[in-house]
C-alpha cells in the first residue's frame, strides 16, 4: 500500500495557477456534449481518473473524441448508441448518477458499474424517481447498488418531483431525464445545491427556469425540441481542490496563497466563507462571468477560532474534511451538523475524520449527522485514507503543522493528479510503497 510522509512546514507564500480543473464542470462538459449535434470544444478538461472514465463512456456511446494538450473536441453521434460493453464510472458517483438520468430517455440497454467503493454507494435516490417515470433500472440490493442495469424509455412521463434532500447529483439526473420527457417537468429541493447543470444547460439553449417557491428551490424543464448548442468552454480551476491549499495557508503561520482562475459560483465557495468566519483573511477577486463567475481567491494566515456549521451544507459537503483540519487547530469548539450525506461519500467521512483526528491527539466525537471538534495541538500520526481522496489530501495538509504519514494515497488521482507536486512546493514530501 502506497504512502506519503510530509514534514512540518515553515511559512510560505505561493501563487498557484495550475490547480486541478473543476471536476464537476469537466464531468458535465463531456456528458452534455451528447445533447448537441455539433462538436463541443472543451479547454482545460480535468485529466483525472474519474473524468477520464466519463470521457471513455461518452466514446462508448458513440462520440468521437479528439484530444490535444490544450483542448478536447467531442463530436457527438447522430443518436446515442447502445454500447457493446459495461460502462465503468470508476470512483465517480457523479458519473453514475448523471448517466442514469442522461440515458433514461434513450432507447437501449446500458450497464453502469464502478470500483469497489462506488458499488457500495446508494443509487436508489436516483433510480427510484427515474423508475417512476418509466425508466427500467435494476441492480444489487433491490436496485440500490451498482452494477446498475438500465433500459431506457423514449416515452418518459412528465413529472413533478420533490426531492427530500438537496443533492446536485439527484437534481441533475432528473433534469437530464426531463429533457427527453413527453411534457414539462419540475424538480424541487429543500435547499439550493450546486447549480452547474442548470447554468451550463441554459447556456447551451435549454429551456430551464429556476426560482424559489414555497420555501423550496425549483427547476422547471421544457423537453428538447431540437439539439442544444455545442459547448465552447474553458474549465476553471476547482474550488474544492483549491480549498486544500486555502486551509494550508490558514493554518501555517505567516503564510499566504493566491489561487488563480477559480470558479466563484456561490454554491461552490461556501467553505472559503466559513474559513473567513473562523478568522482567516480571505479575498475574492472576480475577473469574468460567462457560464460561471471566475476569479482569484487570496488566503492569508490569521488566528482561527471555532465555528458552528449547519447551513448551506450542500455547498461545502466536499470541503468539510479539509475544513475539519482548520477546526482541529482553531481555538475552541467547532460543530458540524446536518451533514449526514458525509456517511455515503467515497467513505464514511464522519467516522474517518473523527477517528483520524483522534489519532492526531485531537478531541473529537461523532454525531449521526456530523461531529464536534475541540481545537488543540495536532500530533504526527499514521493516517488511513479510507480509500478516499479528500481524506488523504486533508490529512496531508494537516501535516504542515505537525508532520504526517498518510497511507493508501493512490485515490488522490481520482480528482487532483498534481496535488503532491503542488504540495512539494511548500513542504518536503516523501513517497513510498
Curated annotation (Swiss-Prot):
* Binding positions (3-phosphoshikimate): 23-24, 28, 167, 169, 318, 345
InterPro entries found in the cross-reference section: Enolpyruvate_Tfrase_dom, Enolpyruvate_Tfrase_sf, EPSP_synthase, EPSP_synthase_CS, RNA3'P_cycl/enolpyr_Trfase_a/b
Which keywords has UniProt assigned to this entry?
Amino-acid biosynthesis, Aromatic amino acid biosynthesis, Cytoplasm, Transferase
Q: Which residues are the signal sequence here? A: none
Binding residues annotated for phosphoenolpyruvate, in chain numbering: 23, 93, 121, 169, 349, 390
* GO annotation (BP), single: chorismate biosynthetic process
Q: In what pathway does it function?
A: Metabolic intermediate biosynthesis; chorismate biosynthesis; chorismate from D-erythrose 4-phosphate and phosphoenolpyruvate: step 6/7
EC number(s) from the headed UniProt entry: 2.5.1.19
What GO molecular functions are on record for this protein? Answer: 3-phosphoshikimate 1-carboxyvinyltransferase activity
Kindly state which reaction or reactions the protein catalyses. 3-phosphoshikimate + phosphoenolpyruvate = 5-O-(1-carboxyvinyl)-3-phosphoshikimate + phosphate
The superkingdom of the source organism is Bacteria
Where do the catalytic residues lie?
318
HAMAP family, per this entry? EPSP_synth
Instruction: Tell me what this protein is called.
Output: 3-phosphoshikimate 1-carboxyvinyltransferase
Q: Which organism is it from?
A: Nitratiruptor sp. (strain SB155-2)
Lineage, uppermost ranks: Bacteria, Pseudomonadati, Campylobacterota, Epsilonproteobacteria, Nautiliales
Amino acid at each position: 500500500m502506497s504512502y506519503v510522509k510530509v514534514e512540518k512546514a515553515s511559512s510560505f507564500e505561493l501563487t498557484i495557477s495550475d490547480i486541478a480543473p473543476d471536476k464537476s464542470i469537466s464531468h458535465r462538459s463531456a456528458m452534455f456534449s451528447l445533447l448537441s449535434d455539433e462538436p463541443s470544444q472543451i479547454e482545460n478538461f480535468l485529466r483525472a481518473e474519474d473524468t477520464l472514465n466519463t470521457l471513455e463512456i461518452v466514446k462508448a456511446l458513440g462520440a468521437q473524441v479528439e484530444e490535444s494538450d490544450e483542448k478536447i473536441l467531442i463530436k457527438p453521434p447522430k443518436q446515442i448508441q447502445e454500447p457493446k460493453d459495461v460502462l465503468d464510472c470508476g470512483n465517480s458517483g457523479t458519473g453514475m448518477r448523471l448517466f442514469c438520468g442522461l440515458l433514461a430517455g434513450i432507447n437501449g440497454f446500458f450497464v453502469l458499474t464502478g470500483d469497489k467503493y462506488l458499488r457500495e454507494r446508494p443509487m436508489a435516490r436516483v433510480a427510484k424517481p427515474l423508475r417512476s417515470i418509466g425508466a427500467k433500472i435494476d441492480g444489487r440490493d433491490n436496485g440500490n447498488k451498482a452494477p446498475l442495469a438500465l433500459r431506457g424509455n423514449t416515452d418518459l412521463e412528465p413529472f413533478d418531483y420533490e426531492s427530500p434532500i438537496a443533492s446536485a447529483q439527484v437534481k441533475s439526473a432528473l433534469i437530464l431525464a426531463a429533457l427527453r420527457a413527453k411534457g414539462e417537468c419540475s424538480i424541487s429541493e429543500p435547499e439550493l445545491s450546486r447549480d452547474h447543470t442548470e447554468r451550463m444547460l441554459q447556456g447551451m439553449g435549454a429551456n430551464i427556469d429556476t426560482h424559489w417557491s414555497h420555501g423550496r428551490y425549483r427547476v422547471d424543464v421544457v423537453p428538447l425540441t431540437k439539439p442544444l448548442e455545442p459547448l465552447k468552454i474553458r474549465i476553471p480551476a476547482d474550488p474544492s481542490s483549491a480549498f486544500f491549499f486555502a486551509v494550508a495557508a490558514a493554518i501555517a503561520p505567516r503564510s499566504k496563497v493566491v489561487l488563480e482562475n477559480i470558479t466563484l459560483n456561490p454554491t461552490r465557495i461556501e467553505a472559503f466563507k466559513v474559513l473567513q468566519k473562523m478568522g482567516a483573511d480571505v479575498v475574492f477577486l472576480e475577473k469574468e462571468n460567462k457560464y460561471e463567475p471566475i476569479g482569484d481567491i487570496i488566503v492569508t494566515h490569521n488566528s482561527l477560532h471555532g465555528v458552528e456549521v449547519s447551513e448551506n451544507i450542500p455547498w461545502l459537503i466536499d470541503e468539510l474534511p479539509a475544513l475539519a483540519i482548520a477546526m482541529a487547530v482553531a481555538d475552541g469548539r467547532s460543530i458540524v451538523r446536518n451533514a449526514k450525506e458525509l456517511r455515503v461519500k467515497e467513505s464514511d467521512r464522519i467516522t474517518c475524520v473523527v477517528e483520524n483526528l483522534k489519532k492526531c491527539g485531537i478531541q473529537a466525537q461523532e454525531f449521526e449527522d456530523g461531529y464536534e471538534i475541540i481545537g488543540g495541538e495536532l500530533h504526527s500520526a499514521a493516517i488511513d485514507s479510507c480509500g478516499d481522496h479528500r481524506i488523504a489530501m486533508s490529512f496531508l495538509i494537516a501535516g504542515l503543522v505537525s508532520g504526517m504519514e498518510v497511507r493508501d494515497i493512490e485515490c488522490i488521482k481520482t480528482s487532483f493528479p498534481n496535488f503532491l507536486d503542488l504540495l512539494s512546493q511548500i513542504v518536503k514530501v516523501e513517497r513510498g510503497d
